[in-house]
């Protein structure tokens, strides 16, 4: 079924300078890390795959649960079926129960589902058991419950052929929450408490400014809390015995007018059901249903756990009940009263002492994750509850003898609920496939939005802000910049989700000042109770802290120094607090947080280039991120490569089995980028299990490679790189260094219409042979054809209704006696502004038994690939939030060059660094030069001080080395300065860059040196998805809006540019009266004038006088609607008649010129097709 979902690939452990990747065959990256990580990075997709395996109850999940110590683990589907069972009829004489959910094989492979627009799903079967309680008869059947979407190995779902991701949702955990507010009028501190269930009515208690304790049931009117206690069967004496210590409770009891349980119940009933006649029985039932019946009220396991923990109840006992108990209510009231009276602890009836304090709702101990499994489970629960109603009705209407489980069950509501979730839920999202990192980050995203979460309009600053409890759980850097800032986050590298949905992070246990190798995963609540040291606290070889005072974090994120024996735990890694994308920024510790945020986000926007190149300066995270993203091909077993081609790789495993891996070739991703895999192994080569054997998009030798290493000079250049503009060398254009391939999909279908069937054909009316040159006999463009905007990709004709014939046509009909074919051209054409080469065609036809929507006979898809070279206006960025638009591309000979004649590739402005405080880019530039040139530290006279912390392996490295500088544990400034002075000379024996990282550059135009030395080095530059080709747009004539008669807006509609109020003022200020008149009339909504002008331009005549714009006529109509008599007079006082612009001359002129100046707003569905 679903076993083996996760790529079991282990991470990198750094025991010495060369990263000994536990991924075999990985490229060696020289690492500047000083610390050993005792724990490998967990599977980066586990947050998705583990949750789904819990839902379907896979064997792998079950075994892991048993290993954790669970006796009888229950999967998500089993759990929801157990909740539903048994469904009883209204008399209780019949019942239907469900058990044992299981899956058949999936219907089609992932590739086939993508190709044919199918859903990757497996049939779900359950055992349904019908019991007739009167006769004791039992009927059992296996029932099909619909096709259930399955998760792919990459943690995604294929829904109707598109790849989607279900994002984990951050919500407030069910439980009991105490709050504190200050009354504005009396300035008294007031306290309140909410009991929030997973499902059911809220119960709220509060102390008001008159010092009475009140209760609100299900958000209705407030009542004295003693009314609720009496309704639960408490007498005045019992209340006094339990709460006698509290004046405010005694005061509330005095003000309470109800005398006993019955009166209290009726009082509550009147508040909850005003207008209905109260009876004791109905009041009792109502209260029980509200809080004490599992069908109506569910705290959920996590809610029960939180309530027990907060109030000190049932300590050490397993969680059984999920409803409220009487003791819960009483303990909550006592806790509230003690909190209000300023007490700091209370002892509950079991002898457990609990601290009394206010809760912080933004703390990660009070916020949990609803992962994909739980989100789908909730949706199935909704579908099953709808089905339950149908089953109950059918039990009463059908003949008891003939009833079988199959006749009772209607699976439609369940199937519809699942479909609705995957198709329309805010948390089921179109996967971000711009590059492998964007896909990986999307799967690890945490969203506070969505059903049951926050809305971006109502979310305040507190919930968006970074909280101390986020440490090691949610990245404080990576979040969107817009209105969603702080509401959408990313899971930290080492974080995992526990069975209750709380995020845990690992720590190393410290005992008596000695760091052990024991790893404990702690939730935010548990971490608050401990003292935690940071990962780089100095220790000796035995793990004992070398300093007497150690810097630690305590509750609330406060930092202080304590003695070594007070430390409980220590971080496992310096990169523990950040997400995958943030952990890929070298020298992150030298960047301002705002720019680091942009850097992390912009890495996700990098487009895959024709030739990927891994960064010279990495962080050691590149390999693991690329493998877990799933876009590279990994060998499953150890063996020998038997055969390699561009399309597949065959491995002969050591156990005698042969396995072929198919490679994706030039496939289109969700974002139109090119996903292409290529082998990196040779026939006869030995490979280990887990080794990368083929690269995907944006990877090189299995490492993430989002951009290019370019030789950068940081200097102003003639003002052409002012305001973040970038100057590039023409070499990058000519040699396709920053060239990317983009693939667009164009689709057309042939339907049945009221006038007959549409036809895909080469026989298109009124089209020349030149236009049809690239179409085959079916009317579909050939593969390899170069196409431009307006070219026909697929010829299609649609029948049209009979029209009035002209006398000439009638004469022709009479002579030749044939009825000309009444069809119109509805061919698929290349949209404006697009061009490229046809690389693929897929034809689906009803005749070939392909699944097509109702009414569609044939469907054709054409894939057009575009090779986009870098050009002016494209956006480039580094990894430190340093982004800019290309302002100028210079010939290579004009670029500044080094003393040996090497021209630089890119010039960035110096002003982009100081106020943005992203110094990481400068350090990266220096280290990039060191890595490219190679280095050799002179240790003949002893190791220099600056190199004392470097291991021996780092004393020298050849040219073109790749280095890793992990976040918070990378190369230090002193080491960089020393390495710059130790770089290897070039082949002429010269060192190009000085020890301060600068070089004398020469002007390419004059050959003169620039007056000052310039920082030169290698920086990793990304080409972002904001390409000028997608944005540039021009219009001569085009569609007009039917209503305003003005041109439409936007590139998609082939619209014009808006000339607004302020632009008109600018024209007035310049006195450009005729230009302004032209803009407001013939270029806009003067319907008569624009046709005449077009005619004049075609015939080469002078431009005629403008007419009256349509908007002026609208103004007149508005004034007339206000009962004002408005006349328009010419300059000599003669009245001008305002005619509507639909005269025949206009239409005839337009028809003669072959132009259509009206908006093609489709009149019918057939026209749209």
From Swiss-Prot:
Note: Mutations in the RRDR sequence (residues 423-449) confer rifampicin (Rif) resistance. Rif blocks transcription initiation but not elongation.
InterPro entries per record: DNA-dir_RNA_pol_bsu_ext_1_sf, DNA-dir_RNA_pol_bsu_external_1, DNA-dir_RNA_pol_su2, DNA-dir_RNAP_su2_dom, DNA-dir_RNAP_su2_hyb_sf, RNA_pol_bsu_bac, RNA_pol_bsu_CS, RNA_pol_bsu_protrusion
NCBIfam families, per database record: PRK00405.1, rpoB
Reaction catalyzed: RNA(n) + a ribonucleoside 5'-triphosphate = RNA(n+1) + diphosphate
Lineage of the species this protein comes from: Bacteria, Bacillati, Actinomycetota, Actinomycetes, Mycobacteriales
EC number: 2.7.7.6
Gene name tied to this protein: rpoB
Kinase as UniProt keyword: no
A cellular-component GO term for this protein: DNA-directed RNA polymerase complex
Signal sequence, renumbered to the chain: none
Presence of the UniProt keyword Nucleotidyltransferase in the record: yes
Biological role stated in the UniProt entry: DNA-dependent RNA polymerase catalyzes the transcription of DNA into RNA using the four ribonucleoside triphosphates as substrates. This subunit often mutates to generate rifampicin (Rif) resistance. Interaction with RbpA partially restores Rif-inhibited transcription; once the subunit is Rif-resistant however RbpA no longer stimulates transcription.
UniProt superkingdom: Bacteria
Effect of residue 449 to P: Rifampicin (Rif) resistant
Biological process (GO), any one: response to antibiotic
Gene3D superfamilies documented for this protein: 2.40.50.100, 2.40.50.150, 3.90.1100.10, DNA-directed RNA polymerase, beta subunit, external 1 domain, DNA-directed RNA polymerase, subunit 2, domain 6, RNA polymerase alpha subunit dimerisation domain, RNA polymerase Rpb2, domain 2
Name of protein: DNA-directed RNA polymerase subunit beta
One Pfam family matching this protein: RNA_pol_Rpb2_45
Stretches that traverse the bilayer: none
Similarity remark: Belongs to the RNA polymerase beta chain family.
């Amino acid at each position: 079924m679903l076993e083996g979902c996760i790529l079991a690939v282990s991470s990198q452990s750094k025991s010495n300078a060369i990263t000994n990747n536990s991924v075999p065959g990985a490229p060696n990256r020289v690492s500047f890390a000083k610390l050993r990580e005792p724990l490998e990075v967990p599977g980066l997709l586990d947050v998705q795959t583990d949750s789904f395996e819990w839902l379907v109850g896979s064997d792998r999940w079950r075994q892991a649960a048993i290993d954790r110590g669970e006796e009888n683990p229950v999967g998500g589907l089993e759990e929801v079926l157990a909740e539903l069972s048994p469904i009883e009829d209204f008399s209780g004489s019949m019942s239907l129960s469900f058990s044992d959910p299981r899956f058949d094989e999936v219907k089609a492979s992932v590739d086939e589902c993508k190709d044919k627009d199918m859903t990757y799903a497996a049939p779900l079967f359950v055992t349904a058991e019908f019991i007739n309680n009167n006769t004791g008869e039992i009927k059992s059947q296996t029932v099909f419950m619909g096709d259930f979407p399955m998760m792919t190995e990459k943690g995604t779902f294929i829904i109707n052929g598109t790849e989607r991701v279900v994002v984990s949702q951050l919500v407030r955990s069910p439980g009991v929450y105490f709050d504190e507010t200050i009354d504005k009028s009396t300035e008294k501190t007031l306290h309140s408490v909410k009991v929030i269930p997973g499902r059911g009515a809220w119960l709220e208690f509060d102390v008001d400014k008159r010092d009475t304790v009140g209760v609100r049931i299900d958000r209705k009117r407030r009542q004295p809390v003693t009314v609720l206690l009496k309704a639960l069967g408490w007498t005045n004496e019992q209340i006094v015995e339990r709460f006698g210590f509290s004046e405010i409770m005694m005061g509330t009891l005095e003000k309470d007018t109800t005398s006993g349980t019955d009166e209290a119940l009726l009082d509550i009933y009147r508040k909850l059901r005003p207008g209905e006649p109260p009876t004791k029985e109905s009041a009792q039932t109502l209260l029980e249903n509200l809080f004490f019946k599992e069908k109506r009220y569910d705290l959920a396991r996590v809610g029960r756990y939180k309530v027990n923990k907060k109030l000190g109840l049932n300590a050490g006992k397993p969680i059984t009940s999920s409803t409220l108990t009487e003791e819960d209510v009483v303990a909550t009231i006592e806790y509230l009263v003690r909190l209000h009276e300023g007490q700091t602890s209370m002892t509950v009836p079991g002898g457990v002492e609990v601290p009394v304090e206010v809760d912080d709702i933004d703390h990660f101990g009070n916020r949990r994750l609803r992962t994909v499994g739980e989100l789908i489970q909730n949706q199935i629960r909704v579908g099953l509850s709808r089905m339950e109603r149908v089953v109950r009705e059918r039990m009463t209407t059908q003949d008891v003898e003939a009833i079988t489980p199959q006749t009772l069950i209607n699976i439609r509501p369940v199937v519809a609920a699942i479909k609705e979730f995957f198709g329309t839920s805010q948390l089921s999202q179109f996967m971000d496939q711009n590059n492998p990192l964007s896909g990986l980050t999307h799967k690890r995203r945490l969203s506070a939005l969505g059903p049951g979460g926050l809305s971006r309009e109502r979310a305040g600053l507190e919930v968006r802000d970074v909280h101390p409890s986020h440490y090691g759980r949610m990245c404080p850097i990576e979040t969107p910049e817009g209105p969603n800032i702080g509401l959408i986050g990313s899971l930290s590298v080492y974080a995992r989700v526990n069975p209750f949905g709380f995020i845990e992070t690992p720590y190393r246990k410290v005992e008596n000042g000695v760091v052990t190798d024991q790893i404990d995963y702690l939730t935010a609540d548990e971490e608050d109770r401990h003292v935690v040291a940071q990962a780089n606290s100095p220790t000796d070889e035995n793990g004992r802290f070398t300093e007497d005072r150690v810097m630690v974090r305590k509750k609330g994120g406060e930092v202080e120094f304590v003695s070594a024996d007070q430390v409980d735990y220590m971080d496992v890694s310096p990169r523990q607090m950040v997400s995958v994308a943030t952990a890929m920024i070298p020298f992150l510790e030298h960047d301002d947080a705002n720019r680091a945020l942009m850097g992390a986000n912009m890495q996700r926007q990098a487009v895959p280039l024709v030739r990927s190149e891994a960064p010279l300066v990495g962080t050691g995270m590149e390999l693991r991120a690329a493998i877990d993203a799933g876009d590279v091909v990994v060998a499953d077993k150890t063996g020998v490569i038997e055969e390699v081609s561009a399309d597949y790789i065959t491995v002969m495993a050591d156990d005698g089995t042969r396995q072929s891996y198919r490679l994706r070739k030039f496939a289109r991703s969700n974002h139109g980028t090119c996903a292409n895999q290529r082998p990196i192994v040779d026939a006869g080569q030995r490979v280990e299990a887990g080794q990368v054997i083929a690269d995907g998009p944006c990877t090189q030798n299995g490492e993430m490679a989002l951009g290019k290493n370019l030789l950068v000079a940081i200097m102003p250049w003639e003002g052409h790189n002012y305001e973040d503009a970038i100057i590039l060398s023409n070499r990058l254009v000519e040699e396709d260094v920053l060239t990317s391939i983009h693939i667009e999909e164009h689709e057309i279908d042939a339907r049945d219409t009221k006038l007959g069937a549409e036809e895909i054909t080469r026989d298109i009316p009124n089209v020349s042979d030149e236009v049809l040159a690239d179409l085959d006999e079916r009317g579909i463009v050939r593969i390899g054809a170069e196409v431009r905007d307006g070219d026909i990709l697929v010829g299609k004709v649609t029948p049209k209704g009979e029209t009035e014939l002209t006398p000439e046509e009638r004469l022709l009909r009479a002579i030749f006696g044939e009825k000309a074919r009444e069809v119109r051209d509805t061919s698929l054409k290349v949209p404006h502004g697009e061009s490229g080469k046809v690389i693929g065609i897929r034809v689906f036809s009803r005749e070939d038994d392909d699944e097509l929507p109702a009414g569609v006979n044939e469907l054709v898809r054409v894939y057009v690939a575009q090779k986009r070279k870098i050009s002016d206006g494209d956006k480039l960025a580094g990894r430190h939030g340093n982004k800019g638009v290309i302002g100028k591309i210079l010939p290579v000979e004009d670029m500044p060059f080094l003393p040996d004649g090497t021209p630089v590739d890119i010039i960035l402005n110096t002003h982009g660094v100081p106020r943005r405080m992203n110094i990481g880019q400068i350090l990266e530039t220096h280290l990039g030069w060191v890595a490219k040139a190679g280095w050799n530290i002179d240790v003949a006279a002893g190791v220099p001080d600056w190199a004392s912390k470097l291991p021996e392996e780092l004393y020298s490295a050849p040219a073109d080395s790749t280095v890793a500088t992990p976040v918070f544990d990378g190369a230090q400034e002193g080491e960089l300065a020393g390495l710059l002075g130790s770089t290897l000379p070039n082949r002429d024996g010269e060192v190009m860059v000085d020890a301060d990282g600068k070089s004398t550059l020469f002007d390419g135009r004059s050959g003169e040196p620039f007056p000052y030395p310039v920082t030169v080095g290698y920086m990793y530059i990304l080409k972002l998805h904001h390409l000028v080709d997608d944005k540039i747009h021009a219009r001569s004539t085009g569609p007009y809006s039917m209503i305003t008669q003005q041109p439409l807006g936007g590139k998609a509609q082939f619209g014009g540019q808006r000339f607004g109020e302020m632009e008109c003022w600018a024209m007035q200020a310049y006195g450009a009266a005729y230009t302004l008149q032209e803009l407001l009339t013939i270029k806009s909504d003067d319907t008569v004038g624009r046709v005449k002008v077009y005619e004049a331009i075609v015939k080469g005549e002078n431009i005629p006088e403008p007419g009256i714009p349509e908007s002026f006529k609208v103004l007149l109509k508005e004034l007339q609607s206000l009962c004002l008599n408005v006349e328009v007079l010419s300059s000599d006082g003669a009245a001008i008649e305002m005619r509507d612009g639909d005269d025949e001359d206009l239409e005839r002129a337009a028809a003669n010129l072959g132009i259509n100046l009206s908006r093609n707003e489709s009149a019918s569905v057939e026209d749209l097709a």
